[in-house]
């Protein structure tokens, strides 16, 4: 048992949302002093040039970023590069502040190496995040994930997303339109092409920042194809695949059905996330940047996503179960694999297994 695994057993005795708050506060405190932050970054951040790539015209020092959901309000913008991430996606943030769903709303599924959440986009609002981003001098790229305010009716969703895009687009490296969380009533209905088209068109009209859309793993293959075609048609920069799943199939943790509704992240979503990635790559090729998220735990998992078409990767649940060195281990393993397979750059490996 590693040191973190022993510590994790203790941390897992405390309620998930409470320990998240405590650990996040500790990480921010440790990475606030310049000297300590730079020392950590010097040891943990991806430095191997083989890992660097240019995506959206921006240099990413490593492909693995922190997924949306951990740092909803951009409170830890300096923290993530110091912990070895190549970038971070903050949010989901909505046009108006909202408290999210009642607690408890975050649960561990330890036998499945998974989490179940029904957070409901609890956040301080787009204006507050814009203030933080304005003050921030970036050590790494920062994406922003935007969602619909719960109180906004579906027929006003376009303006709700557009408002967030106006405020945050100029301050973000890239903008992700989240229409795939299962925890806001009716949100996933916006993935239907006839609903999605006006939202994406409006968001693109508000900003020159690269715009991506985040999709659910529970979509049918036909729906995945339609969204890929729409993204290409509208000139989107890419797709983030995938969000959490509402499926409970194959879960081993006792009592999971009694926990209530929510989205499952981590190992149980890995297979479908990979399937969706491969389908998107076959459909769109290099016309879209694909960011793969969902069930990435090891460097081998990361390698499979890269060679299946992902230019960038993300993780949240893997970080919770893997600990503070998780991102470094992924990046180190990827660098070793790239060289072993004869690649001189990460970009050359993207989609290589799909071209054989």
Swiss-Prot record:
InterPro entries for the chain: Aldolase_TIM, DHO_dehydrogenase, Dihydroorotate_DH_2, Dihydroorotate_DH_cat, Dihydroorotate_DH_CS
Gene: pyrD
Residue sites binding FMN per the record: 68-72, 92, 145, 178, 214, 242, 266, 295, 316-317
Main location: membrane
Pathway: Pyrimidine metabolism; UMP biosynthesis via de novo pathway; orotate from (S)-dihydroorotate (quinone route): step 1/1
UniProt-annotated binding residues for substrate: 72, 117-121, 178, 183, 243-244
Catalytic activity: (S)-dihydroorotate + a quinone = orotate + a quinol
Keywords in alphabetical order: Cell membrane, Flavoprotein, FMN, Membrane, Oxidoreductase, Pyrimidine biosynthesis
UniProt EC number: 1.3.5.2
Name of the molecule in the record: Dihydroorotate dehydrogenase (quinone)
Catalytic residue positions: 181 (nucleophile)
Record carries keyword Flavoprotein: yes
Cofactor requirement: FMN
Superkingdom of the source species: Bacteria
GO BP term, example: 'de novo' UMP biosynthetic process
PROSITE patterns tied to this protein: DHODEHASE_1 (PS00911), DHODEHASE_2 (PS00912)
Organism of provenance: Mycobacterium sp. (strain KMS)
Any Gene Ontology CC annotation: cytoplasm
């Amino acid at each position: 048992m590693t040191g973190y695994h022993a510590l994790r057993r203790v941390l897992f005795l405390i309620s998930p949302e409470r320990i998240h708050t405590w650990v996040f506060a500790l990480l921010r405190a440790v990475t606030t002093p310049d000297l300590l932050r730079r020392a950590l970054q010097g040891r943990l951040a991806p430095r191997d040039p083989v890992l660097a790539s240019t995506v959206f015209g921006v240099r990413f020092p490593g492909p693995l970023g922190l997924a949306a959901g951990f740092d909803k309000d951009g409170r830890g913008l300096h923290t993530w590069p110091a912990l070895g991430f190549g970038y971070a996606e903050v949010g989901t943030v909505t046009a108006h502040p909202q408290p999210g769903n009642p607690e408890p709303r975050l649960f561990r599924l330890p036998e499945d190496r998974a989490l179940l959440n029904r957070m409901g986009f609890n956040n301080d609002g787009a204006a507050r995040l814009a203030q933080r981003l304005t003050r921030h001098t970036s050590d790494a790229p920062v994406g922003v994930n935007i969602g619909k305010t719960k109180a906004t009716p579906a027929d006003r969703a376009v303006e709700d997303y557009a408002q967030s895009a106006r405020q945050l687009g100029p301050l973000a490296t890239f903008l992700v339109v989240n229409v795939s969380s299962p925890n806001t009533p009716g949100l996933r209905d916006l993935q239907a092409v006839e609903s999605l088209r006006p939202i994406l068109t409006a968001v693109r009209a508000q900003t020159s920042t690269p715009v991506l859309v985040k999709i659910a793993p529970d979509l049918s293959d036909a729906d995945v194809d339609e969204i890929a075609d729409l993204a290409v048609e509208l000139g989107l920069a890419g797709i983030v695949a995938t969000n959490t799943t509402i499926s409970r199939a194959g879960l081993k943790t006792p009592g999971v059905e009694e926990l209530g509704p929510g989205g499952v992240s981590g190992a149980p979503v890995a297979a479908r996330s990979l399937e969706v990635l491969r389908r998107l790559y076959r459909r769109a090729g290099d016309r879209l940047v694909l960011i793969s998220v969902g069930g990435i735990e090891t460097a081998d998992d990361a390698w499979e996503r890269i060679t299946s078409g992902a230019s960038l990767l993300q993780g949240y649940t893997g970080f919770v179960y893997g600990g503070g060195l998780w991102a470094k281990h992924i990046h180190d393993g990827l660098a070793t694999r790239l060289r072993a397979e004869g690649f001189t750059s990460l970009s050359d490996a993207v989609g290589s297994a799909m071209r054989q």
